């Protein structure tokens, strides 16, 4: 259950913090952005209101994510927790129409696979 502003305990000391970049959100996008900026030498502060890992519906990674995960040095960890995904299928609400897309048939033939992961495990990495 989320706390209301009056229930949040402030930090014992308030200090003026300076940075080059303030990243709001520590999920996959925010933490990746903060990591890449810090690698470039920027002073980064990342702010996240939630506690991680937390329950969240699964994360459906796309093939274009794979090179970035390699660059971040976490590809092997993702492989251990992920279920290999070679494509996606879309179904209409009435299930009368479907569309199957195989990643190997997409615009970049080199990016032919991805993973489906549990978000809580993904957040830990």
Describe each region flagged by the PLM.
Residues 2-8:
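Short gly/ser/thr-rich secondary-structure transition/capping motifs
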Residues 12-29, 45:
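Beta1/beta-strand and adjacent pyrophosphate-binding region of the FAD-binding site
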Residues 22, 38-59:
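Glycine-rich FAD pyrophosphate-binding loop
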Residues 32:
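Conserved SAM/SAH-binding loop-helix junction
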Residues 54-95:
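N-terminal FAD cofactor-binding segment of flavoenzymes
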Residues 92-125:
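Conserved N-terminal helical subregion
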């Amino acid at each position: 259950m989320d706390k209301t502003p009056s229930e949040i305990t402030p930090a014992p000391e308030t200090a003026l913090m300076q940075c080059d970049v303030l990243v709001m959100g520590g999920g996959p996008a925010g933490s990746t952005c903060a990591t890449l900026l810090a690698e470039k030498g920027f002073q980064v502060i990342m702010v996240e209101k939630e506690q991680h890992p937390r329950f969240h519906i699964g994360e459906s990674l796309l093939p274009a994510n794979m090179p970035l995960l390699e660059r971040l040095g976490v590809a092997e960890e993702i492989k251990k927790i992920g279920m290999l995904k070679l494509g996606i299928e879309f179904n209409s609400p009435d299930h009368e129409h479907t569309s199957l897309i195989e990643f190997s048939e997409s615009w970049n033939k080199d990016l032919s696979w991805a993973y489906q992961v549990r978000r809580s495990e993904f957040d830990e990495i």
